[in-house]
Amino acid sequence: GLVIHRAILHDLTGVPQLLDWLSDGEAAIVRMEKLMTRELELQTAIDRISAFVESDLGGQIIRLTESRLMLLPPGCRGVRGLDAEAFSVDSSDLR
């Protein structure tokens, strides 16, 4: 089955662990509240995550809430459902 990790991203030092999980074929739900007030660090984290997940790995990023993302490895897809449900977003929408 699919392993789904829960994580709180406090700063950029947590990004490599997220990428490792995705490389291993595991998903992650990431809370980013701690970075929301640090715009440059938030943007850097999103850029690194989206470059790896979408471009290098072929996975998907789903925006669950304003400060929460779900990172999916290749072979897993989020689909649009009801308006209140999560849906796939372009990485430029995360900025």
Which residues fall in each region the model found?
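N-terminal intrinsically disordered, cationic/polar leader segments
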Residues: 1-14, 21-22
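Residue-level signature of catalytic and energy-coupling elements of molecular machines
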Residues: 49
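Conserved catalytic network of the ASCE P-loop NTPase/AAA+ motor domain
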Residues: 20-22, 62-63
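Conserved residues at beta->alpha junctions
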Residues: 9, 33, 65
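Short acidic, S/G/P-rich loop/turn micro-motifs used as interaction or catalytic elements
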Residues: 34-39, 77-78
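Helix-rich interaction surfaces within compact, conserved domain-sized segments
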Residues: 52-95
